From Swiss-Prot:
Family as reported in the entry's similarity comment: Belongs to the V-ATPase G subunit family.
Function according to Swiss-Prot or TrEMBL: Subunit of the V1 complex of vacuolar(H+)-ATPase (V-ATPase), a multisubunit enzyme composed of a peripheral complex (V1) that hydrolyzes ATP and a membrane integral complex (V0) that translocates protons. V-ATPase is responsible for acidifying and maintaining the pH of intracellular compartments and in some cell types, is targeted to the plasma membrane, where it is responsible for acidifying the extracellular environment. In enterocytes, acts as part of a pHCl-2 sensory pathway which mediates Tor-dependent larval growth and metabolism in response to zinc availability.
Single biological process term from Gene Ontology: terminal branching, open tracheal system
GO cellular component: plasma membrane proton-transporting V-type ATPase complex; presynapse; vacuolar proton-transporting V-type ATPase, V1 domain
Methyltransferase in keyword set: no
Presence of the UniProt keyword Nucleotidyltransferase in the record: no
The protein's name: V-type proton ATPase subunit G
PANTHER family: V-TYPE PROTON ATPASE SUBUNIT G (PTHR12713:SF11), VACUOLAR ATP SYNTHASE SUBUNIT G (PTHR12713)
InterPro entries per UniProt: V-ATPase_G
Length: 117
């Protein structure tokens, strides 16, 4: 009986040791997965920063700075408004005279669709 108890104890000890090894292997696997995930995240972030930097360079090269674009738009608007003001000043008096002629020179006529019965 003592040999059976000793055999059972050895089996229990072996089972416990195997469970510890399995648990340790799971922990190592979890650590490796976490490390791989961290490395992948870091690599993705580096790639994203590199692409962002390349895009900023491309944008600066082809579009100029935003302030420069805004200044150019403002200058274009000022030029167009000045042109409109000049056009208004040159055409205002003849236009007003033409409108006044229509108002003052009324020639009453019977409408062509009017039927007098």
């Amino acid at each position: 009986m003592a040999s059976q108890t000793q055999g059972i104890q050895q089996l229990l000890a072996a089972e416990k040791k195997a469970a510890e090894k399995v648990a340790e292997a799971r922990k190592r696997k979890a650590r490796r997965l976490k490390q791989a995930k961290d490395e992948a995240t870091e690599e993705i972030e580096k790639f994203r920063q590199e692409r962002e930097r390349a895009f900023k360079e491309f944008e600066a090269k082809h579009m100029g700075s935003r302030e420069g674009v805004a200044a150019k738009i403002d200058a274009d608007i000022r030029v167009k408004l000045a042109d409109m003001d000049r056009a208004i000043q040159t055409r205002k008096d003849p236009f007003i005279l033409e409108i006044l002629q229509y108002v003052y020179n009324i020639s009453p006529e019977v409408h062509k669709n009017y039927n007098h019965k």
